[in-house]
Amino acid sequence: KWKLIAQYINLYYDMDIIENHPGAPVVKANIGFVDLSYRITNKQSIRFELQHLWDNINRSNTEESATVGHEDVYKKRGNWAAALVEYSIAAKWFVSVGDKYNYGNPIADNRDHYYTASLGYIHESTRIVLTGGRQSEGMVCVGGVCRVVPASSGFSLSITTSF
């Protein structure tokens, strides 16, 4: 009835190359996450996800970068924590709520919560998800395809299928 997945990642992320921020320092981070699922019945389950990112950023890095014109790079830096709870019914419907928070940002005004809530339906190989909340700016990678996304608030509808 219980299922646990845990992972650790040691990340070296060159913002100069990946996001075109010439002269920006390299992000060296450690990421850990735990995904814990519990099957309540044959048709119901609940899943908990916890994530943490430890960043190499500190106040002196931020001040040094601001003097050379990279202060925008630090809007999303510092340690992050995230949590998500998802409830599934009949393996077709699910609802989830989550929060991502960069509590370790050295600039207090940039310590933001990014709340989200989702409702989804799965039929065979098609998944439809309506999500509302806040999205932090930065690189988003799904299935090996990465893109830079702006910060946003609102709703999104996602339809994914395979054939």
Regions of interest found by a model, annotated:
Residues 1-163:
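Exposed, low-structure sequence patches enriched in small/polar residues
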